[in-house]
UniProtKB/Swiss-Prot annotation:
Pathway: Carbohydrate degradation; glycolysis; pyruvate from D-glyceraldehyde 3-phosphate: step 5/5. It comes from Mus musculus. This is Pyruvate kinase PKLR. Its EC number is 2.7.1.40. Substrate binds at residues 116, 313, 338-339, 371. Transmembrane segments: none annotated.
């Protein structure tokens, strides 16, 4: 039989749920041909022809309805369409290759959700100009309220990091550090802008006290490694273990050394004040080692910056060991795999990644996967196959956001890199085993008397039961949307808000599509709710993931203000 839009008898719903499951299972056991019968599995097209196309997302549907994770893997189909709307947010680092207004417009169109400014490089004047360009590019899409895409701005602090100086050849120069040669690592200020292949200046004055003979110094994410042979009055005499080309202002790592740098430097305090004055949405706090480092950042932001989200970057062994205490006081976590892969063995980075993503998912806090995701696209138009798998597996692990660094800051193909991450994420999201994920998250969730959280759990469960195309939530601060995201619905979460800051910040949460509603409140509360819900529906139609006949879950409050979300309804799109 064929079910037409808006003509579904109520008594057929139990049959639909059973049919979805049975058809998916028959792909494994019911097809002729014995154990290999799954090769002749029911296609998505056959399944949707049986059940009608208006009531659920079609992507990888047989796999989504599998009983076990192994069945789910067997039913994945390379010919299935990707998800219509990407759930994982894309963070792009803004630099010389991407800071023009026209290039930023292209990147927003390609899928950039959060623009990252790296304060390890550039002056305040430089970053102020970048912020102005980002906002101008984002506001160019504001002519249509339905298609307007809020873009968050994130400030990435320098943190207690160590960097090399400037080479005497100038800011764009490079020198080759040859394997087996001798290099002096010094803090003598006369070499700060006069570095060469034999002398490298670093900005950590106590380096001679914390590094022992035989210790290693890694430069530029470990591309260059030096072994300390002698500690002298002028600095550290080292032998090049692995050579390479050294540029300006490259990061330095001292594994196993007890670096005594403060959690926040004087420059960090100035940068955070700059962020508050320029209304940034997110702080990426670098080299967080313990909970007190996060508290120090919060104190530095002051009351004026209390609405800014703090995402702690885990980049060293101590941060991994104290992960739980850091997570408790943070708004989210970033896995900065570059420095982390130097501080701990490279073969253990994937373990740290999976652990951090899992714990963030359980806590319901955003988690960002960063560093070298599409590194080859700095110079090439297409990534390696290993890189595409890395991005996809970060999505499958449960990351809320995936980040581009040098690919967009200095690369030759910044727009193409964003497009590639967008395409990979769409395919990976279709392959997520949502049924198992939701059940595990629900079982692991502690008992709650918070009406908003209880309503969020019920809304996500209802979205699975009725195969809803979307969950529309009206939110003031973004908290309701984040709670819905916590339980990883298969349906898109359309968050309608009047708060521009909330609209930008909810990009940190997976599966949330923010809509900034600019109309003034109606005199009658119920009328205002209906208008905002309709605004969400119209935007969903425009973006292509809502159609006539689809079911949507609507989550609203019972009165104006934040903290009153406890009403859930089911609507049919007409």
């Amino acid at each position: 039989m064929s079910v037409q839009e808006n003509e579904l008898p109520q008594q057929l719903w139990p049959w639909i749920f059973k049919s979805q499951k049975d058809l998916a299972k028959s792909a494994l056991s019911g097809a002729p041909g014995g154990p290999a019968g799954y090769l002749r599995r029911a296609s998505v097209a056959q399944l949707t022809q049986e059940l009608g196309t208006a009531f659920f997302q079609q992507q990888q549907l047989p796999a989504a309805m599998a009983d076990t994770f192994l069945e789910h893997l067997c039913l994945l189909d390379i010919d299935s369409e990707p998800v219509a709307a990407r759930s994982t947010s894309i963070i792009a680092t803004i630099g010389p290759a991407s800071r023009s207004v026209d290039r930023l417009k292209e990147m927003i169109k390609a899928g950039m959700n959060i623009a990252r400014l790296n304060f390890s490089h550039g002056s305040h004047e430089y970053h102020a100009e970048s912020i102005a360009n980002i906002r101008e590019a984002a506001e160019s899409f504001a002519t249509s309220p339905l298609s307007y895409r809020p873009v968050a701005i994130a400030l990435d602090t320098k943190g207690p990091e160590i960097r090399t100086g400037v080479l005497q050849g100038g800011p764009e120069s490079e020198v080759e550090i040859v394997k087996g040669s001798q290099v002096l690592v010094t803090v003598d200020p006369k070499f700060r802008t006069r570095g060469d292949a034999k002398t490298v200046w670093v900005d950590y004055h106590n380096i001679t006290q914390v590094v022992a003979v035989g210790g290693r110094i890694y430069i530029d994410d470990g591309l260059i490694s030096l072994v300390v042979r002698k500690i002298g009055p002028e600095g550290l005499v080292t032998e090049v273990e692995h050579g390479g080309f050294l540029g300006n202002r490259k990061g330095v790592n001292l594994p196993n050394a007890e670096v005594d740098l403060p959690g926040l430097s004087e420059q960090d305090l100035l940068d955070l004040r700059f962020g508050v004055e320029h209304y940034v949405d997110i702080i990426f706090a670098s080299f967080v080692r313990k909970a007190s480092d996060v508290v120090a950042v919060r104190d530095a932001l002051g009351p004026e910056g209390r609405g800014i989200k703090i995402i702690s970057k885990i980049e060293n062994h101590e941060g991994v060991k104290k992960f739980d205490e850091i997570l408790e006081v943070s708004d989210g976590i970033m896995m900065a795999r570059g420095d982390l892969g130097i501080e701990i063995p490279a073969e253990k980075v994937f373990l740290a990644q999976k652990m951090m993503i899992g714990r963030c998912n359980l806590a319901g806090k955003p988690v960002v996967c960063a560093t070298q995701m599409l590194e080859s696209m700095i110079t090439k138009a297409r990534p390696t196959r290993a890189e595409t798998s890395d991005v996809a597996n970060a999505v499958l692990d449960g990351a809320d956001c995936i980040m581009l660094s040098g690919e967009t800051a200095k690369g030759s193909f910044p727009v193409e890199a964003v497009k590639m991450q967008h395409a990979i994420a769409r395919e990976a999201e279709a392959a997520v085993y949502h049924r198992q994920l939701f059940e595990e998250l629900r079982r692991a969730a502690p008992l709650s008397r918070d009406p908003t959280e209880v309503t969020a759990i019920g809304a996500v469960e209802a979205s699975f039961k009725c195969c809803a195309a979307a969950i529309i939530v009206l939110t003031k601060t973004g908290r309701s949307a984040q709670l819905l995201s916590r339980y990883r619905p298969r349906a898109a979460v359309i968050a309608v808000t009047r708060s521009a800051q909330a609209a930008r910040q909810v990009h940190l949460s997976r599966g949330v599509f923010p809509l900034l509603y600019r109309e003034p409140p109606e005199a009658v509360w119920a009328d205002d709710v209906d208008r905002r819900v309709q605004f969400g529906i119209e935007s969903g139609k425009l973006r292509g993931f809502l159609r006539v006949g689809d079911l949507v879950i609507v989550v609203t409050g019972w009165r104006p203000g934040s903290g009153y979300t406890n009403i859930m309804r089911v609507l049919t799109i007409s």
